[in-house]
Regions:
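Serine-esterase "nucleophile elbow" of acetyl-processing enzymes
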Residues: 1-43, 50-59
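Alpha-helical cap/lid subdomain in secreted, periplasmic
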Residues: 24-29, 49-133
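A short linear-motif detector with a strong N-terminal bias
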Residues: 43-44, 115
Length: 133
């Protein structure tokens, strides 16, 4: 089975040694082919675009989406992420590909460089809403 993992820095394995991300671990521990299509800093809109340009052309059996935290950090809302996830699910179903939605863990802190543009209280509330959704 071929599974394309579409996501942001959590999928990429940001700040981990090469070969130590969760997609790499799944490739070693399961008989399936897991393709890492993560891009650090990507938003849910970016995932939606890359679904058509990078994931579906690979003819996967399944696409696993995990993202939305970057949208929430930048906008303080989960609305854009929810809309993009729904669109990705519909596009996968239309293409005959099984969609799987991964739930990112709730954000508790933000990088120092984001603090001037991120309302942490609002982002935490939106992140919790997104996880519950």
């Amino acid at each position: 089975m071929k599974i394309v993992c579409l996501g942001d820095s959590l999928t990429t394995g940001y700040n981990l040694a090469p070969g130590e991300g969760w997609v790499d671990l799944l490739n070693r521990e399961t008989p399936h082919l897991w393709v890492n299509a993560g891009v650090a800093g990507d938003t849910s809109t970016g995932l939606l675009v890359r679904l058509q340009s990078q994931a579906l052309p690979q003819k996967p059996d399944m696409v696993l989406f995990m993202g939305g935290d970057n949208d929430i950090m930048l906008t303080g809302s989960a609305d854009q992420a929810k809309s993009a996830v729904m669109a990705m699910v519909h596009q996968c179903v239309a293409a005959g590909v099984r969609p799987v939605v991964g739930i990112p863990y709730p954000v508790r802190t933000i990088p120092a460089q984001w603090q001037p543009v991120c309302d942490m209280d609002r982002a935490l509330e939106a992140s919790a809403e997104y996880v519950r959704w």
